[in-house]
């Protein structure tokens, strides 16, 4: 007898578990199941045919892949979560009997989760962990600003603060910071670590305000925080040893004073959090970083067309690392201390602040060697002539443009220029005019400081990158010009062939041989512009030799005259119609299995065009309003002068 195939026992119907079935399989409640999935990186799946995956049901359910649930069955943490359930029941039982000693003993023996093997399992290589460092640092920086609550414990907030300070010290020592930006969400930082870009957000330092429970589930965020603290500890350890720094961080010199005698650990942690001290190195060197030597490419640029761009980018990054070298900054009390200290230290500058503001100040406000004082107030009573009083935005804009900007636009009380985001694409559809001006200024400086590569093959002609890659618009114009020229030449040839016989009959027999030869050459030559100009020059020379009275009359055929060509201009309406027809044709040529993806790409392009158009219109309205306000202001000033 043939074995019968039952429905939903194979194929897509046997590939998925619902969340309830997965919890029953693992014998866990919803809280532990969520925590386990977060730690292991298991997420719900979307089946191709939901009705088949749910055994005929069309209800929207959370589905997990059967292989993922089978993978969780072999996880040792599952046993720890089950033991926690038993301990929770025993602790409640001891508290109900008011046996506090037994309750404390069971709390002390409460099973702890060990996540080391999960970190190694999810990130087999160190570069894989660096790629996932964005969310890790963003969450830890947020937890470091939280107070201790019932869910977010004090131990988690302290560990988050320690790990973030250690990470900032590494970025300072490695000079890895590349981009900074201020937004309503916080401070954006982007660093280049081991060839990977890491972007994280530091929230603004405002007082903590509790939220409603339905807005954010802090228990889920705590699960992420527990995993990210273990992960960040491993990463900081590897990063510190990669640049020969001692981990955990220590001071490069001893601090024997009355303050350290009381609580040395607290004193050292505060000084490290100040971000203003050099850390101890394992190789015994000082904190000064040596400038890396740029190796010149001695081969042909034809083999690697982007060598010049790579070389220029390396030079720009090398200059950026020492942007604030030789400058001394002093921070006023009203400006945010930690982000500014972090940025200035990353680019080689020296910084200090008021001693009553935070520990770790190295010089006072009265120091005459201070070059810049960062303030955020309209005016100050006492000012020093030897320094510039600037607003904090100058530091951020100088880093993003990779040059020291003029300070006159950032003076105390001045209206600041727009703060442009560095996280934009070069091929963006809308670019603000201020950003275009900044790009032109940067390109002008790069042209002044050109780099001359080593010449090895001087015999071969060097072709620059601009010559190799032609502009598509210029190429199209050249093609249009060539087509129009060919059309005019063909039309002139046809006219000449029809009038050639009549021109031969009209020739005069009394002309001399020189005029006949000139006429024959004129009839036989082509109608190219260059050759006609040569013939005209020869004719003018002969006319100068002959007397004025014997000047011959030219009997060239009328068809030989050069006519001015008309410039072809496209009709915008017809062009739009043709573009729509081509787009419809491309959509028909897309295969059925790729149509959904193609429609998404088309919608994305339309959305980008719409956003660019809206931004351009908004900018135009703002500029128009500014001009109207300026005109109104000028009118009022004129009235006041006349009055």
From Swiss-Prot:
Residues 569-643 form a coiled coil. It holds the Pfam family BRCT_2. Residues 464-475, 524-544 have a biased composition (Acidic residues). It is found in: Nucleus, Nucleolus; Nucleus, Nucleoplasm. Residues 319-412 form the BRCT domain. GO terms for cellular component: nucleoplasm; PeBoW complex; preribosome, large subunit precursor. CDD domains: BRCT_pescadillo_like. One of its GO terms (biological process) is maturation of LSU-rRNA from tricistronic rRNA transcript (SSU-rRNA, 5.8S rRNA, LSU-rRNA). Keywords: Coiled coil, Nucleus, Ribosome biogenesis, rRNA processing. SUPFAM superfamilies: BRCT domain (SSF52113). Residues 437-475, 492-571, 609-643 are annotated as: Disordered. The keyword rRNA processing applies. GO terms for molecular function: ribonucleoprotein complex binding; RNA binding. Residues 492-518, 609-635 have a biased composition (Basic and acidic residues). The keyword Nucleus applies. PROSITE patterns: BRCT. Its main location: nucleus. Belongs to the pescadillo family. Required for maturation of ribosomal RNAs and formation of the large ribosomal subunit. This is Pescadillo homolog. The lineage of its organism: Eukaryota, Metazoa, Ecdysozoa, Arthropoda, Hexapoda.
